Each structure stands twice: as structure tokens, then as C-alpha cells.
Amino acid sequence: SVAVFETSKGGDLVLKSYDSESIVADPALEASRISQSRIAIGDLAQRLKLGKSKVRYAISGQAVFTRFVKLPPIQADNVEQLVTFEAQQHVPFPLEEVVWDYELIDGAAEKEAVIVAIKGDALDEINGTVNESGLATAEVDVAPMALYNAFRAAYGQPEESVLLVDIGAKTSNLLYMEGTRFFTRSVPVGGAAITAAIAKEYHISFLDAEHQKISNGLVGLGAGYDQ
């Protein structure tokens, strides 16, 4: 999916256009996923007339290491040094092999930071796909964090606890918010797993199972839902 935003005179983001393209999530075609993505992004860029625009995109939470760390009371000038030390302790790869960043969490009772990291070669592959589509990279975000920022931008700080469930093809992101605190977890289960289960149960192809799921699937809204 690609969306085009513009900044209003008041500084708010305004959605100008949006489009999406389907990618086959068949595990048997996993080797072609990068090429599928490149073609899809290129087609979207052409339809939305993006030219050689710089884009901001989000990476699946499953592909990124995320860790929340508490920081002791320190001077603001020493925060980056301390977070770097924490990253060295928690990131499961040498820092010279990853691209990483952090963000301080506003409003927490204790000073807290969220650290995100991705292997450099993995990010290069994703950037390569974007660049080969004729676009350039402005910023890279992590899907759960982008979801959090989008929710806060639209609804502000929730008064009650909120759980957002973002179900993708291969990965689902869980985002739990309580006051100013939030917690994320990415699990390697998504819509493709349901499609694969249908294909196995009825002895049909993945593509046929996907069609059946979309055409005939029903969502169970639970006993508490009033028709």
C-alpha cells in the first residue's frame, strides 16, 4: 500500500491519494517475494505519479529487533551514550552490523527508551527494492511504531487501555496502550496461515484457497455482538 500526504497550512497531514497492490503470499513462492514487491511498488508509483519521490516506509515488526529499556536519572547530554551502552547489551548482533535508533518515551514515570535495530544487509535489500522501483528512501519506520503514531495522531492519548491487532499476510502486530505507556509484540502468524490451512483441509491450491477465503469467509464477531 502507498499513500500520498501533503502538509496543510496548519501543519496537519492531509491524505491526497492512496492505492494498493496484492502480492501472492504462497509459501511456495517465497523466493519471488522481493521481485513481486519491486513490481508492485513500481506499479503503485506509476499510478500515483510519484516520479522519483522520496518515500517513508515501515518494515514488518518481525524483521526488526525491538527492546524497551529503563534509564536511570541522568543529564540529557548523557542519554545517547547510555542508550548506546544499553543497545550493546540487548541487540543480539554487533552494533557495527546493524542499523539502529532509539526514541525516548514521553510521559513515562521513569525515563524509558525504545531501541530498534535491523541487520544492515536486510535493510539494504529492502532499500534496494524501493530504489529499483524508481523511488528513494527518506525515512524508515517500524510497522508497530507507525501504527502507534497513527493512532495517537488520530485519537490522541486514550483514556482507557487499548489493544490494536494489525493482521498482515505473514505477521500480526499486537499493540497495547495504557496511558502514556505502550507495548508491542509481533507474531509470525497472519492471513497466509489461514489460507494454507484451508488449502490443506480441502486439498486445493493456495490461490484457490485465498479466493475462497476472501469470497466466502465470515468474521466471528463474538457472542457480545448485537446483530
Say what each PLM segment does:
Residues V2, L29-E30, V64-F68:
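Switch/connector loops and helix/strand junctions flanking conserved nucleotide-binding motifs
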Residues S1-S22, V55-A58, R152-A193, I198-E201:
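Gly/Thr-rich phosphate-binding beta-strand-loop-beta motif of the actin/hexokinase/Hsp70
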Residues A209-Q227:
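Adenine-nucleotide phosphate-binding core of ATP-dependent small-molecule kinases
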Residues V79, I204-S205, A209-Q212:
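Small-residue helix-packing motif on alpha-helices
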Residues K54, A58-A153:
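Active-site neighborhood for divalent-cation/phosphate handling
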Residues S1-V4, Q81, G222-Q227:
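Short, intrinsically disordered, charge-balanced linker/junction segments flanking boundaries
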Residues L15-Q46, V79, A223-G224:
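N-terminal phosphate-binding loop and adjacent alpha-helix
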Residues I41-K54, S133, I204:
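Phosphate/pyrophosphate-binding loops at sites that engage ATP/ADP/AMP, CoA/4′-phosphopantetheine
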